[in-house]
Amino acid sequence: MEKLKRKIAEQGTVLSDEVLKVDSFLNHQIDPELMLAVGEEFASLFREEGVTKIVTIESSGIAPAVMAGLKLGVPVVFARKRQSLTLTENLLTASVYSFTKKTESTVAVSASHLSKDDKVLIIDDFLANGQAAKGLVSIIEQAGAKVCGIGIVIEKSFQTGREELENLGIRVESLARIASLAGGKVTFLQEVGS
């Protein structure tokens, strides 16, 4: 998705060979027009899958997930990272490791929001090692629902996340695939060798 790649090139900050900061448009401040375009792209990619729900993880996955939900006409459920007074029973949970934060947390979704009849699209802001997405897959499977794909805004293709998810037989679509962050420069996958 060229609009997203331009935004990454113009406003993204490479903090290390493994960390890209995009807080000016995705995971702190949000660019609504860009997120609408992201949602439209995900809707186009997954429209034929018969999606009935979108699942994401708080908080950076919520904006792209909501826009995709709007375009697909389906509800969005987000897995909570923190215990809530209103989210205490009948929970589907999974343990996930955050590559960026270097922490493990338990995420939860109320079982009342997913059913065995749901066809679920997972959407998240980043794909690195795939642990967050695998946690969401586990939650969806606990509900007896079907994962029909995973939509990622920015994929760090130099890490193992895509391979791990595809090895589970899951379709992964990423709107921007980064081959490298070496030398403080973002190199997109199709630029390699050109």
Curated annotation (Swiss-Prot):
Enzyme Commission number(s): 2.4.2.22
Chain's role: Converts the preformed base xanthine, a product of nucleic acid breakdown, to xanthosine 5'-monophosphate (XMP), so it can be reused for RNA or DNA synthesis.
One GO CC term on file: cytoplasm
GO BP terms: purine ribonucleoside salvage; xanthine metabolic process; XMP salvage
Positions of xanthine binding: L20, N27, K156
CDD domains the record matches: PRTases_typeI
Disulfide bonds: none
GO MF term list: xanthine phosphoribosyltransferase activity
Binding site for 5-phospho-alpha-D-ribose 1-diphosphate: A128, N129, G130, Q131, A132
PANTHER family: HYPOXANTHINE/GUANINE PHOSPHORIBOSYLTRANSFERASE (PTHR43864), XANTHINE PHOSPHORIBOSYLTRANSFERASE (PTHR43864:SF1)
Subunit structure: Homodimer.
A Pfam family matched in the record: Pribosyltran
Protein name: Xanthine phosphoribosyltransferase
InterPro entries, A to Z: PRibTrfase_dom, PRTase-like, Pur/Pyrimidine_PRTase, Xanthine_PRibTrfase
Recorded catalytic activity of this chain's protein: XMP + diphosphate = xanthine + 5-phospho-alpha-D-ribose 1-diphosphate
Family assignment from sequence similarity: Belongs to the purine/pyrimidine phosphoribosyltransferase family. Xpt subfamily.
Pathway: Purine metabolism; XMP biosynthesis via salvage pathway; XMP from xanthine: step 1/1
Compartments in which it is found: Cytoplasm
UniProt KW keywords: Cytoplasm, Glycosyltransferase, Purine salvage, Transferase
Gene name, Swiss-Prot/TrEMBL: xpt
